[in-house]
């Protein structure tokens, strides 16, 4: 018998009945109340979180029917919403709206007390909810922070109507109920009391507790708290605004006849300046005008429109009505989140007592930062050439950028170097700036490689540029003369190590330019050498002593002339020549017949040849050599080890 009774109890357990589990899934327990347990559940169709209040059927719960009837008649945005009622043999399940913000008591305990601005907003919503109840003759009789919930937006939801009752106008109540610290003084009289007045007193206690964090009437015993309530004495040692103290003093008036009504509270100075409008009731069109959109959604779920309209009209609070109310609540919350606030609602913020002018500061946003850094590298002659501008853009900083002095001589020239990957070296030659109005753009997508395919055709290019000139002066060049040595294959390869293809071609042209300059110099210089005084010995400080005969001169890449080449053109006289023992050097009219004569004998003075014939001869040589070099680039020949004639130089006579 006992075993059967245990099984029957398990089967009739609230969370084992099919009437509940067919529509909801139990998630957790929210707490235990004075009349039953509250569970957190999820609606299976809409996935809406709800609170289920489990009330067992017994003779002790005489107010159960009254609470359900009162909850059915309430429909206000600041009152917890009744969604579904499930009646079984053992229990009654009341499905309510779930307030995710929790209790107001928890919020006050977490912060100690609430700011006056927030107290104003929350208290206004409490007054609106209580005014709605009093207009319908409903007395709550248990207003306290534990029964005031907050939703996800922080708005008030008045709950727990277990002690509430419905009265008619002028009816007196005699039942002593409520929570002691929030009870009004007239509750302790047995002559009866006004239900609306005790709710206003409880509102005053809640407002005091929100603004100060302390209860106005405290004591260690029941009699001590009762005496303080009857006397109406409370502490005022808190920094509150005078208007707020005025509201508290009027609400906590001991005489209930002098206590204001709920509709008069909104006319106080602390509240009347606010223009907040209470949201419209969520159930304003529940009975006669259902939302067509929600009807279509429920039709997709399998509900018939006639069934939906009947459930809403008769207010059955069954599964059909619960689904409709949940879908409507979701639709209303989404619409309110999209709407922009009205300008009048901005008055809820804290009013500043000081000056309204604020210092404006400029906010630096991350999006305002440039994606590519721009560097401006000016040259020395930039102040003279206003039209010239040199700009470099990098996604990665370059290692080295070299600009030549002569590149800024031409007005209007613009040199732009763009990189996507950091280059290793960028150099510009002196001869780059000879042509006016020329614009050079060098672009690198990858760093220059150490090895280049140009190595394979170096011998052919060297032959085309250095040995293949059609000029007559090319036959006069002697490889044994160290001052006329342009470069060997080794120096040729060193010239190609750095720079781009354009710079490499410029290196060839520079070498040819130096060669013809030396030839023109020999044509326009004459030296008178007396017979018998020709000194065939080499001066002791000649170039051959400083540099061995077999050593070859290196050609600088990217432009600048080496100091050693400058010394070759104008070296100092020997000591014997300065003492008169050497030859007297003058201008000569012809080139020496023997190419083996040492050039140290003619290093006294140099005369610059005329420009017109010099340029004609240079460009003639450049044109022929450049065309032959371009033809040689079309084929890639294997590397051939060719000995340059300059390496077979004959040492000068001593």
UniProtKB/Swiss-Prot annotation:
What EC number is given for this enzyme? 2.7.11.1
| Binding of ATP, residues | 30-38, 53
The enzyme class is: transferase
In the UniProt record, does the keyword Transcription regulation occur? no
Listed under GO biological process in this entry are:
cellular response to glucose starvation
Catalytic positions are: 142 (proton acceptor)
UBA domain location is 289-329
Reactions listed under catalytic activity: L-seryl-[protein] + ATP = O-phospho-L-seryl-[protein] + ADP + H(+); L-threonyl-[protein] + ATP = O-phospho-L-threonyl-[protein] + ADP + H(+)
Which segments show compositional bias classed as Polar residues?
Answer: 342-369
Q: Which UniProt keywords apply?
A: ATP-binding, Kinase, Nucleotide-binding, Serine/threonine-protein kinase, Transferase
Question: Which cysteine-cysteine pairs are annotated as disulfide bonds in the entry?
Answer: none
**InterPro entries linked:** Kinase-like_dom_sf (IPR011009), Prot_kinase_dom (IPR000719), Protein_kinase_ATP_BS (IPR017441), Ser/Thr_kinase_AS (IPR008271)
Q: What does this protein do?
A: May play a role in sperm motility, especially in the regulation of flagellar function.
Full protein name: Sperm motility kinase
Native organism: Rattus norvegicus (Rat)
């Amino acid at each position: 018998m006992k075993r059967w009774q245990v099984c029957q109890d398990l089967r009739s357990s609230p969370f084992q009945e099919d009437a509940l589990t067919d529509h909801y899934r139990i998630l957790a327990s929210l707490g235990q109340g004075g009349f039953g347990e509250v569970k957190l559940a999820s609606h299976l169709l809409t996935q809406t979180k709800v609170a289920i209040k489990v009330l067992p059927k017994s003779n002790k719960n005489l107010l159960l029917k009254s609470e359900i009837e009162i909850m059915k008649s309430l429909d206000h945005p600041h009152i917890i919403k009744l969604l579904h009622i499930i009646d079984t043999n053992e229990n009654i399940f009341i499905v309510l709206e779930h307030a995710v913000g929790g209790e107001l008591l928890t919020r006050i305990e977490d912060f100690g007390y609430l700011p006056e601005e927030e107290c104003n907003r929350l208290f206004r919503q409490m007054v609106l909810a209580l005014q709605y109840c009093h207009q319908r003759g409903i007395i709550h009789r248990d207003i306290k922070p534990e029964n005031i919930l907050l939703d996800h937006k922080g708005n008030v939801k008045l709950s727990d109507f277990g002690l509430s009752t419905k009265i008619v106008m002028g009816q007196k109540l005699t039942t002593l109920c409520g929570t002691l610290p929030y009870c009004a003084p007239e509750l302790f009289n047995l002559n009866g009391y006004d239900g609306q007045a005790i709710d206003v007193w409880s509102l005053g206690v809640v407002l005091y507790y929100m603004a100060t964090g302390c209860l106005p009437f405290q004591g260690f015993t029941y009699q001590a708290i009762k005496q303080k309530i009857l006397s109406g004495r409370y502490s005022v040692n808190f920094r509150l605004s005078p208007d707020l103290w005025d509201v508290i003093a009027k609400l906590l008036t001991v005489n209930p006849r002098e206590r204001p009504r709920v509709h008069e509270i909104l006319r106080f100075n602390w509240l009347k300046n606010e223009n907040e409008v209470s949201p419209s009731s969520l159930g304003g069109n529940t009975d006669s005008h259902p939302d067509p959109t929600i009807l279509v959604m429920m039709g997709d779920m399998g509900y018939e429109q006639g069934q939906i309209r009947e459930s809403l009209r008769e207010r059955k609070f069954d599964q059909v009505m619960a689904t409709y109310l949940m879908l409507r609540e979701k639709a209303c919350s989404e619409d309110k989140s999209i709407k922009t606030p009205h300008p009048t609602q901005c008055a809820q913020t804290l009013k500043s007592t000081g000056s309204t002018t604020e210092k404006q500061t400029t906010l630096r946003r991350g999006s305002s930062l440039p994606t590519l850094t721009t560097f401006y590298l000016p040259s020395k002659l930039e102040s003279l050439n206003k039209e010239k501008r040199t700009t470099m853009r990098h996604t990665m900083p370059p290692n080295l950028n070299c600009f030549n002095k002569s590149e800024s001589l031409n007005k209007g020239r613009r040199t732009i170097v763009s990189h996507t990957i950091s280059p290793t070296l960028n150099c510009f030659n002196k001869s780059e700036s000879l042509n006016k109005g020329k614009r050079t753009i060098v672009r690198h997508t990858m760093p220059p490689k150490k090895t280049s395919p140009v190595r394979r055709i170096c011998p052919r290019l060297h032959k085309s540029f250095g040995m293949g000139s059609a000029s007559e002066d090319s036959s006069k060049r002697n490889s044994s003369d160290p001052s006329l040595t342009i470069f060997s294959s080794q120096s040729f390869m060193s010239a190609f190590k750095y720079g781009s293809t354009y710079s490499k071609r410029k290196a060839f042209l520079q070498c040819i330019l130096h060669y013809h300059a030396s030839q023109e110099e020999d044509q326009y210089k004459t030296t008178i050498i007396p017979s018998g005084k020709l000194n065939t010995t080499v001066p002791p400080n000649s170039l051959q002593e400083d540099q061995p005969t077999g050593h070859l001169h290196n050609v600088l890449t990217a432009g600048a002339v080496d100091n050693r080449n400058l010394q070759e053109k104008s070296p100092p006289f020997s000591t014997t020549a300065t003492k008169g023992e050497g030859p007297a050097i003058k201008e000569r009219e012809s080139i020496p017949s023997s190419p083996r004569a040492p050039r140290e004998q003619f290093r006294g003075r140099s005369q610059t040849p005329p420009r017109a014939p010099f340029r004609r001869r240079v460009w003639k040589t450049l044109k022929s050599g450049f065309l032959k070099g371009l033809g040689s680039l079309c084929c890639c020949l294997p590397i051939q080890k060719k000995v340059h004639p300059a390496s077979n130089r004959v040492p000068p006579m001593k």
